[in-house]
Structures are given as C-alpha cells and as structure tokens.
C-alpha cells in the first residue's frame, strides 16, 4: 500500500474475511480476524463494526490503524489484538473505556507504548476486567498502583474530564493528600475514649473514688501540698511504681466494665510491679508505653492484655529493688484533649545515670545501650503478641496513637528536662556533700553542667540520625541490586530474542539464495528447450514424411506441457519469495524496535546509577562529619571533668 493512503474498513470486507453469507446477520459473528497484508493495510474502521454487537474476539494486527473511532460498538468484545499498528496517543486508547468486557488487549509495537510512560497503568485503570495486556498478565500490584496513580477524581466517565486530565496533568499533591487523610483516620479518638480518660483523670486514677467524694477545699489543699513537694523533694520508687501502674490499672478497670477482664489473674498482675531502678526503670517506662498502646485497642483484645500483663509480672519478679529518688518531672503528664504524655526511655535513663554518678560520658552511653538492649529483649514477647493480635483482626484500630506524636513534643520539653536533670544532680551532690544548696547559686558550675547535658542530648540525636542514614544506605543498595538484576534479566531476554531473529534471518537468506538458484536453472532450461523447439520446427518444415512429423509434434506437445507446468511452479516460487521478503522486512523493524527499547533502558540505568552514586557520596560525607563530631565530644567531656575535679 502506498504511504499516506487512507483505507477504511467496510462491511463487504468484513463479510468476505469472515466467510459470512450476504443474507446472514452480522450480529451472529463471534470472531473476526483481518490482519494486514503487504498490499493492503487498514487505517480507519469507519462504521463497519456497528452491527457486530455480539463479537467476542477481534484481530486487526499488522495494519496501519491511526484511530480507533468506531470500535465503541463492540460492547461484548473480550479479546482485542492491535499488534503492530499506528496508535500514537492515549486519547485513542481511551475509546476502549466503553468496552467493559475486555480481558485481553495487545498494543505491542504501537507508538503509544513507547511515547506514553503511564500507558500500562492507564489501560489497567480504565478496563476493570483486564487480565492480560501486551502478552503479559496483569498483576494485582499493577491494579493498586493504577488506583494510586489515577485517583477517583480523575474520572474516566466523560471525554471532557479525560481531556482535562491529559492537558492539565495530575496534581502533584494527590498522593500526599491520600496519605494525610489516612493518617488523620489513625489519630481520631472516639468520644467514649475521651469520656473514659477524663473520668479516670478526675478520679485520681482510682475508679473506686468518684470525683464527687472530695470537697473543693480538700482538693485545693492537696494540690498545694503536691506542688510544694514537687518543687524541692524527690519521689520514692514506690511512687514511680504507682505512676507506672496507673496505665495498667486504667486498662484493667476498662475491661471490668465490659467483659470483666482476665479472670485468671489477680489485680496485681495488671500493675508494672516493683521497679528495679538500677536497670529496670527504662524497661518500666517502655512497658508503660507499650501497655498504654495495648489498652487503647478495642475491648476484643482481652487475650493480648492478659499476655502482656503476665509478661510484665514475670519481668518485674526477676529484678531486684534498689531504691533511688526520682524527681516529679518523670511522672506522666496530662496533655490537652485527654491524652497523656509518658517520659521516654532516654529521659528516665539519663536521670538514673546522673543519679548513679558515672565517671564519664562513655560509661553513660555504654550503660544506656545495654539497658536499651535488655528492654528490647524483655518486651519482644509482648510486642509479638500484640502484632499477632493485630494481624488476626485484619485492620488496625484508628485509635492507636502513632509514635511520631510522642516524639513531636521533644523539642518543647528539652529545656524543662534539662532543668529537671540539673536539679536532681545538684540535690544529689548536696546530699553527698556537707552543705545544702551550695551549688544551686554557682553560675560557673551551672553553665558547665548545662553544657554537659546539652552535649549528651546532641550526641544522642546525632546517633539516631546516623542510624537513619545507615538504613537509607541499606535501602539504596538493595534497590540498586534489584535494578541490576532486572537489567541483567532484560539483557538476557534481549540477547535471546536477537539470537533467535538472527537465526531466522539467516535461514530466510539461505532459502532466498536456493530459490534464486532454482530460478536461474529453470530459466536456462527454458531457453534451451526453446532453442530445441525452434530447431525441431525447422526440421519439421524440411521433413519429407508425415509420420516423422507427427511423432515430432507429439513429442513437442509433451515438452510444452512440461514447460508450462514448470512455469506455474516458478510463479509459485516467486510469490513465496515475495512473502518471505515481507516477513524479513517485518523482522528487521521488530529488531530495530527492540534495539531502541534496550537503549532507553540503558539510559535509565545510567541515570539511576549516577543518582545513586551522588546520594552515596552525600551520605559518606555526612558520615565523615558525624565521625569528626563524635571524636570531639569525648575530648571535651574529659577536659571539663578535669576542671571540675580541680
């Protein structure tokens, strides 16, 4: 077909290709195959498919279709083959959105596959029953990705909405908005939860004592006494034990209201137990946060609550009690909205390390690492039970608070925490020395102590950032390995395909050479026979007897029949040669398409490698700066320790 020629499909061609008689209805047709040939290639469908309402399978491969207008009538179509056509835009692909029964579509070797990066996700999102696209099965992960990529507001129901989506483009904040809405759902507390928390707070964490039993004057007197004691005195370990047990008692009382809790455990099992303050305070605080998270689940997790309380009891019974005063700052504080803020493990641990009086920052950090490791090992069983319970329920409770909410208040509490730790350190030094309040007014000592505390906090934050950087490096290395494996697999596929096509091309060339040799040989024989025929005719003219002439004519006629048969065979060979030449051209075009695809993949890999290299260099530079910072901190702390001893 000449380039640029317009060939529209008509009903006569449909009847001719399908073998349907002129008096039969086109609605009876179930399958239609009209692949393109070297002489004719369809460019437009027109209205030829209007009456094929029951068609299930349509093959229009190897044509030159530039538009799919007219395919919307095939409402029952399940399989569509448009391999090696000229569809170049998603606007034409969008014409398939009315064919809701489509299960198998093939757009390979169409310009739209190469030009549109979101082509596959678009088709998967547009056709809900699609099972196979471009000779590849549609995975569930691709459906989820298409749903995230094309949000519900990108409606495909009208052509106006679709054109707007194509011209304007997708909003960049779409995924962030989806993430924010899902995060908001996880942070919402029911009105019942708010009421229960307010009631427990008003009852002084004891539901047996209603808020109405205490007079206002008595409340004011107790509040004044509490603040007076908090300003200068320290709490005993029993008070800390009581505070850590409040959360467990709150969960136990809430279970009593609904299902009477765990009947096999005593009320003491719901508390944190006696806290071993040398090594157990961080564990107790961590257990308190863990238990608060468990009790905020629905009432259906009684088994998990019992298991966690039993784990806490067994953990507390293995420790020994060593009393040590703890400041009132480490009690859990009530936040606005009915939520409670619990001191973190590092706050409790930093206070204990200063109360025990370690000789250097290295000893403090080593002890903190050991205690955090013990706390994580001791609580692994309860966390596993909690994860198993959440998995069995299938969905997460929206009332479970994210750990990011607890860490959001750390910058605001840093100054108050520093003051509390400094007060505890000064009180301990005053009790150990003869005087009382001797260092509270010493500005030089206060400045040095504050600097030491801030250095410790900066070191802890730097160590956390280093761990995050290591996780990022590990993730990038894993992603790099995945990309390399994918590239190796694609290169193997490309090599196998090229090898196969090269072998087919060589076989075709050999067949062409053989056919040419046969053709040359046949032409030589034909010319030789013609010369013989000419000689025989001359001899016949000069012959005397009619008998000899008759015999010669009979022989010549037989020779002519044989020659005509050979000529027919030669014509068939020539037609076969033309078909082989067309197949060779198509193979060459497919080979060029594969080469361009491979070059595109190599360019993407090089860009990914360059980006990965830049990120690794940035992380290495950050790690070197971190090492320099950590190398300076011990030197400063040892120098200041020498000044204090002087």
From Swiss-Prot:
Q: Which residues cross the membrane?
A: none
Where's the LRRCT domain?
110-149
Chain intervals with Basic and acidic residues compositional bias: 383-392
Chain spans, region Disordered: 300-342, 357-399
Mark the LRR repeats by their residue spans: 28-49, 54-75, 76-97
Main location per UniProt?
cytoplasm
Phosphoserine: modified positions: 117, 236, 380, 402
Q: Which residues form a coiled coil?
A: 476-622
One annotated GO molecular function: identical protein binding
The record, for Pfam families, names: LRR_9 (PF14580)
Gene3D superfamilies per record: Ribonuclease Inhibitor
Please note every region of biased composition (Low complexity).
307-319
Keyword Transferase belongs to the record: no
InterPro entries per the UniProt record, alphabetical: CEP72-like, Leu-rich_rpt, Leu-rich_rpt_typical-subtyp, LRR_dom_sf, U2A'_phosphoprotein32A_C
Could you state one GO cellular component term attached to this entry?
Answer: centriolar satellite
Compartment(s) where it occurs, according to its Swiss-Prot or TrEMBL record: Cytoplasm, Cytoskeleton, Microtubule organizing center, Centrosome; Cytoplasm, Cytoskeleton, Microtubule organizing center, Centrosome, Centriolar satellite
Q: Which UniProt keywords apply?
A: Coiled coil, Cytoplasm, Cytoskeleton, Leucine-rich repeat, Phosphoprotein, Repeat
Gene Ontology annotations of biological process type? centriole replication; gamma-tubulin complex localization; regulation of protein localization to centrosome; spindle organization
Quaternary form? Interacts with KIZ, PCM1 and CDK5RAP2.
Hey, which family's this protein in?
Answer: Belongs to the CEP72 family.
Q: What does this protein do?
A: Involved in the recruitment of key centrosomal proteins to the centrosome. Provides centrosomal microtubule-nucleation activity on the gamma-tubulin ring complexes (gamma-TuRCs) and has critical roles in forming a focused bipolar spindle, which is needed for proper tension generation between sister chromatids. Required for localization of KIZ, AKAP9 and gamma-tubulin ring complexes (gamma-TuRCs). Involved in centriole duplication. Required for CDK5RAP22, CEP152, WDR62 and CEP63 centrosomal localization and promotes the centrosomal localization of CDK2.
PANTHER family in alphabetical order? CENTROSOMAL PROTEIN OF 72 KDA, HEAT SHOCK REGULATED 2
What name goes with this protein?
Centrosomal protein of 72 kDa
Organism (species): Mus musculus (Mouse)
Q: Which gene encodes it?
A: Cep72
């Amino acid at each position: 077909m000449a380039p640029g020629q317009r060939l529209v499909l008509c009903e006569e061609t449909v009847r001719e290709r399908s073998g349907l008689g002129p008096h039969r209805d086109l609605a009876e047709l179930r399958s239609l195959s009209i692949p393109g040939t070297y002489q004719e290639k369809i460019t437009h469908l027109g209205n030829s498919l209007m009456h094929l309402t029951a068609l299930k399978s349509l093959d229009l491969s190897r044509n030159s279709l530039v538009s799919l207008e007219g395919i919307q009538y095939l409402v029952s179509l399940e399989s569509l083959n448009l391999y090696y056509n000229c569809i170049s835009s998603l606007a034409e692909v969008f014409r398939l959105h009315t064919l809701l029964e489509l299960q198998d579509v093939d757009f390979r070797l169409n310009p739209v596959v190469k030009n549109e990066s979101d082509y596959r996700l678009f088709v998967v999102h547009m056709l809900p029953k699609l099972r196979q696209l471009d000779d590849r099965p549609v995975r569930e992960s691709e459906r989820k990705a298409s749903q995230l990529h094309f949000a519900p507001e990108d409606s495909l129901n009208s052509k106006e909405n679709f054109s707007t989506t194509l011209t304007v483009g997708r909003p960049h904040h779409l995924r962030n908005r989806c993430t924010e809405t899902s995060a908001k759902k996880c942070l919402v507390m029911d009105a019942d939860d708010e009421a229960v928390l307010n009631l427990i707070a008003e009852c002084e964490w004891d539901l047996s004592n209603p808020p109405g039993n205490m007079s206002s004057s008595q409340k004011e007197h107790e509040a004044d006494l509490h603040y007076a004691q908090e300003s200068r005195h320290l709490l005993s370990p029993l008070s800390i034990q009581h505070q850590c047990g409040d959360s467990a008692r709150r969960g136990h009382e809430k279970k009593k209201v609904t299902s009477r809790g765990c009947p096999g455990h005593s009320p003491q099992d719901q508390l944190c137990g006696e806290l071993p303050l040398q090594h157990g305070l961080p564990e107790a605080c961590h257990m308190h946060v863990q238990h608060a998270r468990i009790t905020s689940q629905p009432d259906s997790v009684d088994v998990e609550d019992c298991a966690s309380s039993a784990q806490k009891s067994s953990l507390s019974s293995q420790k020994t009690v060593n009393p040590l005063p703890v400041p009132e700052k480490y009690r859990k504080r009530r936040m606005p909205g009915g939520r409670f803020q619990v001191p973190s493990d590092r706050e409790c641990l930093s206070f204990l390390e200063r109360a025990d009086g370690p000789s250097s920052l290295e000893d403090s950090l080593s002890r903190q690492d050991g205690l955090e490791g013990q706390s994580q090992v001791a609580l692994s069983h309860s966390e596993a039970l909690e994860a198993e319970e959440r998995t069995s329920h299938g969905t997460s409770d929206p009332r479970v608070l994210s750990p990011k909410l607890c860490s959001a208040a750390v910058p605001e509490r840093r100054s108050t925490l520093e003051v509390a730790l400094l007060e505890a350190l000064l009180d301990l030094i005053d009790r150990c020395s003869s005087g009382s309040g001797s260092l509270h007014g010493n500005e030089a000592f206060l400045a040095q102590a504050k600097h030491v505390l801030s250095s410790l906090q900066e070191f802890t934050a730097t160590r956390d950032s280093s761990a995050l950087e290591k996780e990022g490096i590990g993730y990038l290395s894993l992603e790099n390995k995945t990309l390399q494996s994918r590239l190796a697999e694609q290169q193997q596929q490309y090599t196998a395909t090229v090898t196969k096509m090269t072998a087919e091309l060589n076989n075709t060339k050999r067949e062409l050479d053989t056919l040419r040799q046969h053709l040359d040989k046949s032409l030589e024989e034909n010319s030789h026979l013609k010369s013989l025929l000419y000689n025989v005719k001359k001899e016949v003219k000069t012959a005397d007897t009619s008998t000899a002439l008759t015999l010669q004519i009979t022989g010549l006629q037989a020779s002519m029949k044989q020659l005509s048969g050979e000529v027919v065979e030669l014509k068939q060979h020539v037609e076969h040669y033309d078909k082989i030449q067309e197949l060779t051209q198509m193979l060459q075009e497919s080979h060029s398409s594969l080469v361009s695809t491979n070059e595109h993949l190599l360019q993407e890999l090089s860009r990914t490698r360059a980006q990965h290299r830049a990120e690794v260099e940035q992380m290495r530079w950050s790690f070197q700066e971190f090492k320099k910072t950590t190398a300076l901190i011990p030197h400063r702390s040892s120098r200041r320790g020498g000044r204090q001893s002087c």
